[in-house]
């Protein structure tokens, strides 16, 4: 009986986990802020405020990721540094493949929705992101872009 309950629980748990598909990839576009990081040993680090966001732009499974710094007027400070990325699928797992002049690496997309994302690197570190929007606390009434 206990085995049956355990098997049913595992089945339900696995059914709740949605695989990331090619149709989900456009959800990557935009600004993402790290909420927490979970190391492979289980250590968690929570981020209540981030000085930089990750900006993803992807078209036809290729694009870039850039670090941007939000400003109080709703704009972002950017530089010329970016990482080329390509989305690939291996054994039903979606990966972001990064490439710079100095290194190559990839991260598995564990989950992806309109407002949440989890990436896992080769060291089994989990990066939990939330979708972000420009910050405008100046109260100047101007719309941010």
Give the ranges of each region predicted by the language model.
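Short, compact, well-ordered microdomains
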Residues: 107-127
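Edge beta-strand at a domain terminus
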Residues: 120-145
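Short, solvent-exposed coil/turn segments at beta-strand boundaries
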Residues: 28, 55-64, 89-93, 110-117, ...
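N-terminal glycine/threonine-rich, aromatic-flanked beta-hairpin/loop signature
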Residues: 45-91
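Sec-dependent signal peptide recognition
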Residues: 2-7
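C-terminal motif of bacterial Sec signal peptides marking the signal peptidase cleavage site
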Residues: 12-15
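N-terminal helix-cap/turn-to-beta initiation motif at the start of protein domains
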Residues: 18-33
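Short beta-strand segments that buttress and anchor functional surface loops
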Residues: 95-99, 117-120
């Amino acid at each position: 009986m206990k085995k049956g309950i355990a098997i049913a629980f595992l089945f339900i748990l696995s059914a709740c986990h949605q695989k990331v598909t090619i149709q989900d990839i456009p959800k990557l576009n935009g600004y993402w802020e790290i909420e927490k990081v979970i190391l492979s040993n289980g250590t968690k680090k929570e981020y209540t405020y981030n000085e930089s966001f990750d900006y993803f732009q992807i078209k036809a499974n290729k694009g870039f990721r850039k670090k941007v710094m939000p400003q109080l007027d709703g704009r972002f400070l950017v530089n010329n540094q970016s990482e080329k990325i390509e989305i690939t699928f291996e054994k039903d797992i979606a990966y972001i493949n990064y490439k710079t002049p100095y290194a190559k690496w990839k991260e598995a997309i564990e989950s992806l929705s309109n407002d949440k994302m989890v990436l896992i690197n080769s060291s089994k570190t989990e990066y939990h992101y939330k979708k972000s929007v420009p910050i405008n606390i100046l109260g100047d009434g101007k719309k941010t872009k």
